[in-house]
């Protein structure tokens, strides 16, 4: 038997808020392995950045393909390109990355910042120890 469908029983699509749309764009960009690798490579090369050619060589990808990935990351506000002479040097947009992390954790610990103060205390410190890929599996 088919249930009666009423206007009240149909979920109405609501577009994401501008903040949610920005986060979705960033996660869509990072949801592709090569782009995630590019962002991680650019973080390593902060604050100087590296050229498209250097990125392409490091990730073993054609330069035009790499440029396409960089354009997607730039639209997601995760990388910044700046012209230096005849080259474009790319850097991680650390403000954009920070925004994304802050968006994810905006309501952390029911809005009590003191409860999760140490959540990122070890990031970017000499004591910071990132688990190897094998360790992360268990």
Regions found by a protein language model. Name each.
Residues 77-79, 85-86, 101-103:
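Short, Lys/Arg-enriched C-terminal cap helix and immediately downstream tail that follows
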Residues 70-71:
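Short, hydrophobic-biased segments on the C-terminal half of alpha helices
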Residues 57, 74-75, 80:
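Alpha-helical residues within the helix-turn-helix
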Residues 18-62, 84, 88-97:
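N-terminal helix-turn-helix DNA-binding core of bacterial DNA-binding proteins
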Residues 2-22, 40-44, 94-138:
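Amphipathic alpha-helical dimerization/coiled-coil segments
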């Amino acid at each position: 038997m088919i249930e009666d469908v009423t206007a009240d029983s149909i979920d109405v699509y609501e577009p994401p808020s501008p903040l949610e749309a920005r986060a979705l764009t960033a996660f869509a960009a990072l949801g592709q392995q090569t782009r995630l690798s590019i962002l991680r490579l650019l973080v390593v090369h902060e604050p100087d950045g590296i050229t498209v050619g250097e990125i392409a060589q490091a990730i073993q990808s054609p330069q035009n393909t790499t440029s396409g990935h960089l354009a997607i990351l730039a639209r997601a506000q995760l990388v910044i390109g700046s012209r230096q002479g005849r080259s474009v040097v790319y850097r991680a947009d650390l403000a954009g990355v920070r925004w994304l992390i802050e968006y994810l954790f905006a309501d952390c610990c029911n809005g009590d910042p003191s409860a999760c103060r140490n959540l990122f205390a070890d990031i970017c410190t000499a004591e910071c120890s990132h688990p190897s890929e094998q360790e992360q599996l268990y």
